[in-house]
Regions:
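N-terminal glycine-/serine-/threonine-rich beta1-alpha1-beta2 phosphate-ribose binding loop
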Residues: 1-90
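Structural motif
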Residues: 7, 73-75, 98, 105, ...
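Rossmann-fold NAD(P)-binding glycine/threonine-rich loop
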Residues: 81-87, 91, 100-138
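A short hydrophobic/small-residue beta-strand
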Residues: 94-96
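Catalytic, metal-anchored helix/loop core of enzyme active sites in primary metabolism
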Residues: 146-150, 158-161, 165, 177, ...
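A conserved regulatory-domain signal marking ACT and ACT-like small-molecule sensing domains
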Residues: 309-407
Length: 407
C-alpha cells in the first residue's frame, strides 16, 4: 500500500481525499496498489469530519514519516509551499502540486531536485485544472516543435467577459456576481489583472521550450478596463473579447503576452464561455490540437492531482523526465510583435483625417447610441509603430486582435 500526505485541506485538498475514497477500487488497479491518505497538514481542526483523525499541524510529522511516499501540496502561494516541497524531496518523497505560483517560480529547480533523487515532481493541475495539458506537451507532442500556445486559462475572467458580452452588464456588476457565486476571490487581483494566466503561459512555454521563462517578463494586461462600449463594437464586428495567454515562436524568437484580445467567429476559442478554459496548441508536425474543459473547481482540479499521485506511485524509484532546466529563455520584446488592433477614438466621423494620416485608409466603424466616438481596425503593424501612431490621435482604448485559425 502506498501512503501519502496532503498539505492543505481546502477546496482542492478535500477534493483529493474525496476522489481517493470514492474511486478507491479503480485507482488501486491503475496504481498497482491501494493508496491511503495517512496525514493531512492544516492549521485548522475539522471536528466531525472523518479526516480529523489524520490532521497534523506540524510539517515535521510528514517529512520525518518514512511510510509516506508522496506529498501532495495544495496550499497555494510560494511560501511556505516551496520550503515544504523542497524538504519533502530532500526526504525522499515525490511531490504533486496544483500550485501554479510555485511551479512558475521554482519549477526547474524542483524538477532537478526530483531527478537527482529518482523522485518525481508533478504539476498537471497547475495549468488548466482538470484539462490535461502538461502530459500532452511532455509525452504525446514530444515529436513536435511547438510553434504556438494560446489559451483562455482563467475561469474567473472568462466568466466575467462572457457575462458582459451576453448580458450587457458592467464589469463591476459581474465581478460582484462572480464573487457571490464563488467564481472570484474576495481579492480578485491575481485573476482580473492577468497574473494567474500569465503564470500558466510561463509554465507551458517553459515546458514547450525546455528553458525557463520568467513570468515577470511577460507583458501582462488584465480586464479591468474593458467596458460595455468595447463589447458593443465587438458585437458589431461579430467578435468577442477574451483574456488570452499566448506564446509563439517566429523567426527563431519566442514571444509571450497575456492580455484581452478581440477574436472573431473563426477563432478556435470563440465558443469557450463561462468558467470553462480552452487551450490551443500548434505543433510543426501535428498541426492544431485543442484542449477544452473545466479549468478550475474542486473535483476537476483534484482529479488532475490524483492522476499525478497515481503516476508517482506507479513510477516509484524512477524519474519521469520533464525537459525544463534553469537556463533562461529570453523573450523577444513585445514592441516587435506584429498584429492588428481595434481602436476607439474620440471625435466625429466627419473628421477622420488625423486617424487616416496615422493609420492609413482604415474603415470607420460606428455603433448606434455611442456618440462623439468611432472605431477602426488597423492593418498589421508592430506594437511600437502602433504606439507611436496612437499618440497622435485622441484614443479612448485599444484591444489587440488575435487572428488564429484552425488549419
Amino acid at each position: 500500500m502506498a501512503k501519502i500526505a496532503v498539505l492543505g485541506y481546502g477546496t482542492v485538498g478535500s477534493g483529493v481525499v474525496e476522489i481517493l475514497d470514492a474511486n478507491a477500487e479503480s485507482i488501486s488497479k491503475k496504481a498497482g496498489q491501494p493508496i491511503e491518505v495517512k496525514s493531512v497538514l492544516d492549521l485548522r481542526d475539522f471536528p466531525g469530519d472523518p479526516i480529523q483523525e489524520k490532521i497534523v499541524h506540524d510539517i515535521d510529522l510528514v517529512i520525518n514519516d518514512d511510510e509516506i511516499d508522496v506529498v501532495v501540496e495544495v496550499m497555494g502561494g510560494v511560501e511556505p509551499a516551496f520550503t515544504f516541497v523542497k524538504r519533502a524531496l530532500e526526504a525522499g518523497k515525490s511531490v504533486c502540486t496544483s500550485n501554479k505560483a510555485l511551479v512558475a517560480a521554482h519549477g526547474a529547480e524542483l524538477l532537478a531536485m526530483a531527478k537527482e533523487r529518482s523522485l518525481n515532481f508533478m504539476f498537471e493541475a497547475s495549468v488548466g485544472g482538470g484539462i490535461p495539458i502538461i502530459r500532452p506537451l511532455n509525452q504525446a507532442l514530444t515529436a513536435d516543435e511547438i510553434t504556438k500556445i494560446t489559451g483562455i486559462m482563467n475561469g474567473t475572467t472568462n466568466y466575467i467577459l462572457t457575462k458582459m458580452s451576453n448580458d450587457g452588464s458592467s464589469y463591476e456588476e459581474v465581478l460582484k456576481e462572480a464573487q457571490a457565486l464563488g467564481y472570484a476571490e474576495r481579492n480578485p487581483e491575481a485573476d482580473v489583472e492577468g497574473y494567474d494566466a500569465c503564470r500558466k503561459i510561463a509554465i507551458l512555454t517553459s515546458l514547450a521550450d525546455g528553458r525557463t521563462v520568467n513570468f515577470e517578463e511577460i507583458t501582462t494586461e488584465g480586464i479591468t478596463k474593458i467596458s460595455n462600449e468595447d463589447f458593443a463594437y465587438a458585437r458589431k464586428l461579430n467578435s468577442v473579447i477574451k483574456l488570452l495567454a499566448t506564446s509563439y515562436r517566429k523567426d527563431g524568437k519566442v514571444y509571450a503576452i497575456t492580455a484581452p484580445f478581440l477574436i472573431d467567429t473563426t477563432h478556435p476559442l470563440y465558443n469557450v464561455n463561462g468558467v470553462l478554459n480552452g487551450i490551443y496548441v500548434n505543433g510543426n508536425m501535428v498541426g492544431d490540437v485543442m484542449f477544452f474543459g473545466a479549468g478550475a473547481g474542486k473535483l476537476p482540479t483534484a482529479s488532475a492531482v490524483v492522476g499525478d499521485i497515481i503516476d508517482c506511485v506507479k513510477h516509484k524509484g524512477t524519474n519521469v523526465c520533464l525537459i525544463w532546466d534553469d537556463e533562461k529563455l529570453e523573450l523577444a520584446p513585445t514592441r516587435d510583435e506584429v498584429r492588428s488592433f481595434f481602436v476607439r477614438v474620440k471625435g466625429n466621423t466627419s473628421d477622420t483625417a488625423m486617424v487616416k494620416e496615422q493609420f492609413g485608409d482604415v474603415e470607420i466603424i460606428t455603433v448606434d447610441g455611442l456618440d462623439n466616438e468611432f472605431g477602426f481596425i488597423t492593418d498589421k503593424m508592430t506594437e511600437e509603430a502602433f504606439d507611436k501612431a496612437a499618440a497622435n490621435v485622441d484614443m479612448i482604448s485599444r484591444i489587440r486582435i488575435d487572428d488564429t485559425k484552425l488549419q
